Amino acid sequence: MAIAIIGAGLGGLALARVLHVHGIDAVVYEREPSRGARGQGGMLDIHSGQRALREAGLLDRFHAVARGAGQDMRLLEPDGTLLLQEDTPDDAPLDRPEVDRADLRDLLLDSLPDGVVRWGRAFVSADDGLLHFADGGSATYDLLVGADGANSRVRTLLTDARPAHTGQNVIEVSISDIDRTHPDLAAMVGRGNYWVLGNGVSLAAQRNGDGRVRIGLSFYNTAEDWFAASGIPFDDPAAARARLIGLLPGWDPRFTALIAACDDAIVPRAITALPVGLTWPSTPGVTLLGDAAHLMPPVGQGANMALLDGALLGLALAAHPDDFAAAVHDYEDEMFARTGAAARMSADMQESLASPDAARNMLAFFRPD
């Protein structure tokens, strides 16, 4: 029986890999023309998702590319007050290692036989066991798995739910080769995560394996059209940097120096999420995983849940190789409970980050005693 996976993200690839380990064939259809067609974003904090990599037989290879130093953390308030600094010993266990998303995706891609991923196949629709692609091609399937992200087309076969704006808008910037170009800022950020949490505004800087620091400047309790009203001239990087600094009155100059030093690519991103606890009636022949099933605020759960979705669906299919309906039912029962709890936690964390006491709330989270 034919298993079609739409989307070569982490969840879809984890599913394909676990199926391969169990001797089950699947095809992954990806709209991008090649694996390197688009940047894959920054670092991921992989914790619960390590179970998926173990089931995929890739945990040792994952540890080889993960960064234990990425577990370092610094938490500050906008006036410069340091609330928390945790530096990871070199021999510390890799409980929550950081890994470049691109490296993790490459690890999964390289673990699959040639031809499993079909590049340049943009899914359009499905009916009566037939997939239709934007290039006019088609393919048959017995089970269709939507691993096609936040704006999933496969999701429309199961539910009318759509992502909604969460009140958070993010400006993403980065500083390339920071150790050479800005060694003072590199030392300040450290080896892992650097958070400055204010009243409705946060700055999250993250060291990447390629020598850059990625920075997300979040504005909470803001409308979906906030970018248009913000006065940030995205087509003029120098003016955009100046405007962003102007949106941080009273912040320690060390923090605004990160914005002043950033590269010219200044990218706005509105944060959306699916309803917490979204479910749908189990439908033979189709299911979802990852952001397609449970898009949630970006606080460290999404990639882990996607990896687990892929691995656990793969295990369910291996347990019921001749009964896809039973496999999907078992998978969805577990997935709804697990990801519903993760989505609620993520929404609560986002609410905490949006509060006037965000920094102290985060300190209490990491140091509850």
Please give the residue ranges for each predicted region.
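Short strand-connecting beta-turns/loops that link adjacent beta-strands
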Residues: 78-80, 128, 208-211, 322
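FAD/FMN-dependent oxidoreductases across multiple families
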Residues: 187, 191, 198-201, 207-213, ...
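C-terminal domain-closing interface element
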Residues: 349-369
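Short, surface-exposed charged micro-motifs
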Residues: 43, 204
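Conserved N-terminal helical subregion
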Residues: 2-3, 18-22, 45-178, 224-226, ...
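A short acidic, helix-capping loop that chelates divalent metal ions and anchors anionic groups
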Residues: 35-39, 93-94, 224-227, 298
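Short helix-loop capping/hinge motifs at secondary-structure junctions, enriched
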Residues: 60, 177-185, 224, 254, ...
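Conserved mid-domain beta->alpha element of the FAD-binding
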Residues: 5-33, 145-146, 171, 242-244, ...
